[in-house]
Regions:
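Glycine-rich phosphate-binding loops of nucleotide-dependent enzymes
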Residues: 1-211
Length: 211
């Protein structure tokens, strides 16, 4: 069996943006899947705040401090046929503030969603009731960014966070990433955009053929 990612070791510290750059197809996607729990690992360890999460579920990694802006917002970031409110609590709906004995607290969910929509200027036709599929790509991405950086987290994994977006949305997301870094978040950025890499990164790592 060929190892797609082999002998990769690095740390991301609080208050810095570390970028993994390189040509697409050199193991970046598999590395992301290993970190987030979307894929299994053949060996090695993944630590968040010193805690080994290598065998933990996706939810456990999220509750241990990992936020994730995925590369494919439709496949891994949103449930397109849910409304915006429910998408904004996808990572938190099970918390006591949003449910009681398994029953969702819709009033609290909508109150939280309305705040994020205002704070992050997410534009949608019907506010929190908007079906997410009907929103522009830029506003879908804003919704993911809002959700992931508004909940408790220590590390933010941002994978191609501006792919396919217009200039205004790109600048907005870059500002939010810098704000997060300045607030002490550890950010791991995976990007193929050279300008993005050079403008945002405190440190740059390059992957080639899985290493």
């Amino acid at each position: 069996t060929k190892l797609v990612v082999n002998d990769v070791s690095f740390q991301v510290r609080s208050g810095e943006i570390v970028c993994i750059a390189g040509i697409d197809g050199n193991g970046q996607t598999e590395l992301v899947h290993a970190i987030t729990g979307l894929g299994e690992t053949a060996g090695g360890r993944i630590l968040i705040n010193g805690r080994d999460v290598t065998k933990k579920s996706i939810r456990a990694r999220n509750t241990h401090g990992l936020s994730h802006i995925p590369e494919d917002r439709h496949k891994h970031g949103l449930v397109l046929d849910y409304n915006l409110a429910y998408n904004l609590v996808l990572q938190q709906y099970f918390e006591p503030g949003f449910q009681h004995w398994g029953f969702l607290k819709n009033e609290e969910i909508y109150k939280y969603a309305d705040k994020l929509i205002e704070d992050f200027d997410i534009r949608s036709g019907e506010g929190a009731d908007t079906i997410t599929r009907s929103m522009s790509g830029g506003n879908q991405q804003k919704a993911i960014v809002a959700r992931e950086i508004s909940r408790d987290h220590d590390i933010l994994l941002a994978v191609q966070p501006t792919r396919g977006l217009d200039v205004g949305a790109i600048e907005y997301i870059h500002r939010e990433l810098v704000k997060q870094r300045d607030a002490g978040t550890a950010i791991l950025l995976i990007s193929l955009e050279l300008d993005e890499v050079m403008n945002l990164s405190d440190r740059i790592l390059v992957m080639f053929e899985g290493t």
